[in-house]
Amino acid sequence: MSKARSRNSLLSSSNRAQFGNSTQDELLKLKFSMEKPDIGLYPLNDLDNGVDLNGDNSRSQHTAGSGVLSGNEVTYPDYKPWKDHTALPNDKKEQEHQKLNNAAYLNKGYFETPVVANEYYSARNLIQATVFSSTENCNEVLKELSQHLANAYKTRNEIINKIKYESNNFKIPPRVTLTASKKESWLKDLANPDLALSKIAEKIPHGIRNKILIDAVCNKSVPINRALWFTKCVLFGELVALRRKHQSRMSLNSPIPQSLDINTPEKFEIHWLQEWTQQVADYIYKFSKESSNFNTIERKQYYMNKMTYLLTYIQALYVEFLLDKSFFLALIIKFLKEGLPLDPLHVSELLSSTRSETDDLIQESWIEDLDLNYGQRLFALTLIKIFWNDILKFDYICKELSETLLLNYLFISKINAYSFKQSHVQNHKASIPEPLRQKILDMIGDTITYLFKFNTNVFIIPNYWMLINGVLFTILLNKNVTKTEGELDEISKQFDLIKYRNESLILNMRNVQPSITDRATPNSAGRRGSSIWNQSFVSAAESTATKIDIFDNEATFINRSSDDILKIISQLDSLKLNDELANFLKPVTSSSALTSTAIKGCPKWRTNLKVVLYWCITRHRNSRESSEDILIICNFLKRKVLQTLGPTRSSSQLKAEFESEILDIIYNIADTNSSKVVNYDLYVLINELYQLKVLTIASYLRKLIASGIFYVAPDAEDNILNDNSNSLVKTHLSILQNLPVINNRQCDSILKKWTSTGFNFKEKFEMGQEILKRELIDRIVNNTFDDQFESHIVYVKDLNVGLKFLLVNWVTNELKSAITESPKLIHINPLIISNLFNFYSICDNLTVFFKVLVKFILKNEGGMIIFYLESLYLIARLIIKHFKLVKFIAGNSYGSNSTAYELFKLIIQNYKDCKTREFDYFKFDQVWNFIDTAVESNYSSDKNTDSRSSGKRSGIFNKEQFDSPMKINTSENVIAKMEDRYTSADFRNDLDLLLESTFQPMDSNEVSEVVATLKLEFEENEMKSHRNVVPKVLDLLKSNLTEESEGLAAKLLINSQYLIKSDDVNAFDKLVQDYILELVKSDMEILLVAKFLKKLIVHEIIRINDLFAFFEPIAEDPAFRVKLKALMFDLVIGLSDEEREYLSNSQILQLEIMRQWYRERSTSSFLVLILKGIKTIEGSIFDCPLMEKYGSSIFRILNALIVANTKLLSDELISKISTEDSIRLLSTLNNENFTPINSLQDLERIASEVDEFNLPIFQLLLRVLTIKELSPLQENEIQERLKVLLESFLENLSFGFTPMNSYFGELFIYLPWEYVVSILGMLEDKFLCSTTFNFDQWDNDKSVLSLTNSVGNTNLLPVFNDYFKKFSSSSSNVVESSSSFFQALSKFLSKLLLIVNSDNCLEDTFEDTSSAISIFLRILIIHKLTLTRLIVTQDGEQFQFIKNLILLINSKFIAEGNEKLRILLYDLLLLMKSSVTEEVSKQTENELSEGTSPGFGMTAQSPPPVEDASKITEPLSSARPSSEAASFQTNPISTYDQVSSLFNLPEPTETNPFKDYITEDRVECALTLSEDELQSGGDIHGFNESNLVLISSSNDSTFSGAFALITNPHQRPKGQPFKLRSFEILEGTSTTSLNDGCINLQLFDSYTTKENPP
C-alpha cells in the first residue's frame, strides 16, 4: 500500500523541482495580468438557480442575459476578487460590517466559502498537475481530452439540443376581413417605413389580390421591400388555397400522375404563375391607356409618379421571379400589336394599296380615324427597353417583336402627325407632335436594325411579310446612320435571303394567327433560329374553322414574290413604279455598291426589261385612251434606272449595254407575231426613248444595216411591201417611216429602195408646220381659239408618229418665241389650256406639255399671264390627273429638282397672286392636300430628313414605302437671281398656310353683283335665306347659259352650299337631291337631264358617287329603272361627240377628271353598274341598247378592269351575267376577230395562245367553262376531264420570257377549290412518279434527272417549280394528304438522295437538280398542315422520312450547291420538329386518357440511343406499310427523346454575318437592366446561390470512437442544390417561437445552446 499523501503533496507537482520559481512567477504574472472581458460572462448555474454571486436569491439585480450584477464590472466566472467595504454599494456595506464582526473570522481568519462542497473533487489541481508534469505526452493527452470534450458537446447538440424538423411553425400571415377604413389604415401602416413590419404582420387584409393588389401598392407608394413582402404573402396564400382545391379534386379520380399530365404540381404552379402574370400585364395595359386622359398638370404629375413607381415595382417582381418571365415578355409585345387594324378587310385593303396607286387623294377614312393609343405603345416600348437583355435570349419572342415593331412602324408612319399650326389634320386625338412621332419611329427603327443584325432568323415572319417587307428594307437603309460599303452589301444579301425564306413559307401563316402567349412556354428558349416554328401546323389545321383567315374569299389577295414577272406586270398595270421595280431593271455591274438610292443591278434585268417593253406594246393593254402609259414607262426608265447609275465611266458602259438590249428587244418584237403587238404603240415607244436620249437613231440604223435584211434590193416589179412572207422587213420599214428624222440619208436610201414611192419626210413636215402656225400659234396670239380646233388639225393628227414628235418640238419653240415677242398681253384661259392639252395628247407628247409648256405658262413671263383662278385650277387638276407622268419626267440629272416640284411651286405662287383679285370658289383645298401628300414632308425646312419621314397628310399609304415621295431639293439653283429665289422653306411655309386656310364666303355686295349679272329675281326677304337661292340657281343652270354665266351661277351656288352646311351638314345635299329626283321623275328628256347633271359635276357641286346615292330612293322603281340606267351610263361613260354640242373642251376635260376619280375609287360599284346596265331580262347582253350605244367604251372599260381587278370581275360576272354571255364577252375581250370560245375543247385548241398578258382572260374563261361543263359530271368523269385539259396546256406550253417565271403558275388559280386541288394532285403525281433518274455516272448523254411533257419538247421541271412556288404563296385552304401520297414522297426522296451525293448533279444538270429539290420542298410546304399525322402514324418508330430529309440537308449538293435551298429545308425541318412533337403529345394524351390503371402506357425500359442527326450517312428505307399503323404504339418518353435528338440540327450559318457591324450605341438605354442585375439582383439569387447545397447530416458522434472525426477527415456526404421559390422567401415577423421562419432551421443542423463565447 502506498503511503497516504498529505494535502500539500496532492496540491503540489510530482516533480516540483523541475518548475522552480520560474513557474510560480509565470502563474503569478498570469494571475495579476487578467484583462477585463468586453461582454458579460456568467456561470451556467447562476441563471438556472437564480443565485446571486454575493448570496442574494433575488434576480432583480441581474442584467438581462448577462449574469453580472447591476452596477458591477464585468468579470470572469468563478473569479470573485475581494473588495473593501468602501467599494460596495450602500445596501451591501452593512452586510460586510456584520461579516467582519463574525467570531469565526476572528478565530480562524477571513476566508471565502467554496463554490462546491469539496474542492478536492473538482480535479482541477490534479489534472493541471498531471498535464503539466511532463512535455512528452502533453500534446497527446490534450488532444484526447479535447476530442472527448468535443464529442460530448457534439452529442449534446445533435441529440439533446438539436432543433427538430417538426418544430418549424412557419405560417404566412392569415387573411382577415376588415372594414374599408381599417383596410385603408392597414395599407397606410404598410406604406410607413418607420413602423416596424412585425407590428402589422400578424394579419393581412382579405380581398386584396391581383390587380387590386397592384393598384393598392402603387397608390400608397409602399416601399418596394414591403410591397414585395405583401405580394409574396398574397401569392403564397392564393397558391396554398389552390393546392388544397386541386388536391381534393384530384383525390376523387386521380391515377398516378404521369410525366406528361397537365395536372402535375409543376404544371399546375406554372399555370398559376401565368395567371398572376396576366393580371400584372392587364393592369399595365389599363394603366397605359389612361395616359391621354389627364388634362391638368396635377393629374399629369400624379400619373408620372405612379408610373415611375409601377415600373420599379414591375422590375422588382421580374428580378425576384415573381412573374413568368417569358410569358410576361410575350404579353408586353402583345401590347404593341393591340389596336392595330389587322382584321381581314383592312389587311386586304393595305395589301391592295401596295400594288395600286389610288392614293393620290385620300379615299379611305379608317386610317385617318385610327387611334393607336400612343401611351400604350410608349409604355410597351419602355418595358421592352428595361428587359431588353432578357428579350434577346428568347428567339421566338424576338421574332414576334420584330413583326410587331414593323407593323407599328408602318401604321405610325401613316397616321398624320399633330401640329398646332395645322388645323387640316382632323384627328388630333389619334395624333402626336411630329418631333415625338419621329423619335418613336427612330427608336423602333434602331431596335429593328439591331434585331436584324443580332439574328436575322427572327425576321422569318410570313404572316404580314407582303405588308412589311418594304418597311424593313427602308429601315435597314436608314440614311441617318452611316454604313460602310461592306455593311450595306451584307444587308442587301441577308435581306434577299430573308425575303426568299418568307416568300417561300408564306403559306404557313395563312390560316391561323396564333397569339404569342400560346407559344411563350418557359422552356421555349433555344439557340438562334430554333424556335421559328413554335406553333405547330397540326394545331393550325385543326383550328382552321375557328380561326380568322386574313385572306378570306371577300378579301382575296394573291401573294407574289417581288421578282415574279406577273407581279412586275401587275405593277405596270397599276403604274406602281417604285424603286424596287427600278432595281430589277438595272444592268448588272460588279463595281456598283449598295447605297441609299440604288442597289446592285439585277441578274435578270434583261428579262425584266423585255417584260416592260412588251407590256407597252401588247394589244392586251390597248384599252388605254392615249399613249400616256408608254410615256410614263419611258420617263421612269430614264429617271429611276439610267440617271441613278451616275455619270461614271462604268455607268456609261452600262447605259450603252442598256441601249443595246432595248434595240435587241425591238428586233425581237419585229420578228414576233404582229397580232399580239400594236404597231402604233411601238412607234411611240421608240420615239419617246429617242427623245429622252435612251437610244439613238444612229444605233438603230447601224444595227439594222448590220443585220443584212436590206442587203439585197427587191425587184421593182415585186415590191417587198406586198410580200406577206417577209413581215420582219415590213415591220422595220414601218419603223423607219415613223422615226423623228429629216434628211437622214441612210433612212431615205432604204425607204427609196424598198418602197414604191419612198417617204418624203420634209414635205409632210412643212405641211404640218404651216397648219400649226395658222391654227395654233396665230390663234393663241390673236386670241381667236374656238372649240373646233381639233377639226382644223386632222392632217397633223394623221401624220406618222415621228413627224408628230418633230412638229411638237417645233411648235413648242415657236409658240414660246411668238408669245415672248407679242406686243400685247396674252391671257391664258381654260379654252387655250384645253386645246393645247388636246393637241399634245393627240401627238403623244404630254411629256413636253407638262415639262416645257405648262412651266412656261405658269411663270407668267414674256407677255403671258394667268389672270383668273379658273385657268390655274384647270392646270392644277390636269397635273393631279397626270401626276404619274409628271413625277417621273426626267431632269438633267437624278439629283435635280423634279418637274412636279417646280410646277407645284409655280401653282402656289400664281394662286397667291390670283387670290387677291377674285373670289375663290374652286376646290383648291384638294390641290393643297394632294401636294402635301405628294412631296416629302420635312419637319425642318432647312434639312433633308430621313426618308422614313412621312407626310403630314399621307393618306392610306403615303409614297415612302413602295413609291418614294417626291423629294424637295433644298439646294437651290445658284445661277438664279437672289431676288427671284423661292426656296423650299418658302414653299413649305406657303403650303402650310394654304392648308390652314378656310373657305371665305362672298360678302353681300359680291352676292348682289352676281345676282344682278345673272338677272335673278328674288322677293324682298328671299335672299336672307340661302335655301331659297339654291332652287333658283339650279333652274338657271338648266337653261342654255354662256360659260361665263355658268361660272357665276356655280360661284353663287357653292357660296350658298358652304353657308347652308355651316348650319346643317345635310341640308344642302337634301335640297339638291329633292330637286334632282323631281327632275328625273319629270318628262324632261334624258339628254337634257344628263346635260344639267354633268354641269353640276363639272363645277364640283356634286360628285358622281353622291349623285348615284341620290338615285337610291327610286332606283328599284320600275317606272324609272330604264331611265336611270341610261342616265347613269351617260354620266360615267358618255359619248364625246354628243357632249361637244353642249360642253366646252375645258368642261369635257373636267368631266373626264371626275369620271376617272369615280372609276378608280368606286371600282366595285362602277363594275356592278356596267354589268347590271347591260343585263336584260330576256336575250343576250349584246342585244342591249346600252351595249349597242356604248359597246366600244364598255369593252375598253372591261378590258382594263379584268387586268386590274380579276377576282372582282370573276365574282361579278358569275353573279350578274349568264354563262353564255360571260363566255362570249371574255372571248371578245381576248380577240374581237377570233373564233368564239364556247367549250373547254375550244380552250384546249388555243392553249398555245396563253401568255402573261392575256392570262386574266384565260383564267376567267377556265373558271366559267369548268363550272358550266364539269358541275353535272361524276367525280371520276371530272378527274378525267381535268386531266385531258391539263395535258393540253402542258403540251402547248409557249413562253415569251422564261419557263422559270411564267403564267402557268397562276393559270388555274380562279377555278373552284376542288378543281384546283385535283390539278395540284395530278401535277404532284406527274412529278413524283414520272421524273426519270439516271444513276449511271458514266452515261454523260443523259441528264441526272429529267421531266418532260408528253410531246417531249418542254422541260417541265422549271415550269413545275414556278407552279408549286406560286401555289404555296397564294392558296389559302388546307390540302389533304393520303397514305399513297406519303409513300410516293418517301420513294422519291430515297431516289433523290442517291442523286444529290453524286458528282454529276454539281455539273451540267445543276439547274434541273435544284428545280427538283425546290419542287419537292414546295410540295412539303403545301401539305405541311396534314402531313405530320402521316409521318407520326406511318413512320413513328424510326422517323425514316425525317432522317432522309436530314440526309438531304447534309448532302453534297445542298451543302455546296444552293444556300437558299439549304435554308428553306432548315426552316421546314424546324417547323416539322414542333409539329411532330405536338402530334406525339396529342397521341400520348389520348392513350393516357384511355388507360384504366395507374402507370398505363409507361415503361421502365430505357429507349435505345438515337443516332445523331449530323452523323447519318446512308439513306433509310421508306415508311412502313399503313397496315401496321393501326397496331403502332409509341413509348411517349422514348419518342420525345427520339424527336429531340433527331432534330438536333446544325445552325445554317455558324457565325453572325453582322458580327463586325453590330453595335449597341443606338439601342442602349439607362433603363435597361444589366445582365448582372438580372442574374444576381434580388433575394432570389442570394438564396439560390450555386454554392449552397443540401447534404445528409451524420449524427454518429455518440457511437463512434474518440478519433472518429480525425481518422476520416476527407469523407464528405453527397449533396444536392439548395433551391427556394421566390414567393417562399418571406421575412420573418413572428417573435413567439424559435423555428418559425420561412426556412426550417433543421436544414442547417441547427441546435440551441447557452454558453459563454470562447
Swiss-Prot record:
InterPro entries according to UniProt: Mediator_Med12 (IPR019035)
An MF annotation (GO) of this entry: transcription coregulator activity
GO annotation terms (biological process): regulation of transcription by RNA polymerase II
Cell membrane recorded as keyword: no
Main location class: nucleus
Keywords: Activator, Nucleus, Repressor, Transcription, Transcription regulation
Keyword Amino-acid biosynthesis applies: no
Cell location: Nucleus
Start-end of Polar residues biased regions: 1515-1530
Pfam families named in the record: Med12 (PF09497)
Region (Disordered) location: 52-72, 1481-1530
One term under GO cellular component: mediator complex
Top-level taxonomic group: Eukaryota
Family assignment from sequence similarity: Belongs to the Mediator complex subunit 12 family.
Function of the molecule: Component of the SRB8-11 complex. The SRB8-11 complex is a regulatory module of the Mediator complex which is itself involved in regulation of basal and activated RNA polymerase II-dependent transcription. The SRB8-11 complex may be involved in the transcriptional repression of a subset of genes regulated by Mediator. It may inhibit the association of the Mediator complex with RNA polymerase II to form the holoenzyme complex.
Record's subunit section: Component of the SRB8-11 complex, which itself associates with the Mediator complex.
Protein name: Mediator of RNA polymerase II transcription subunit 12
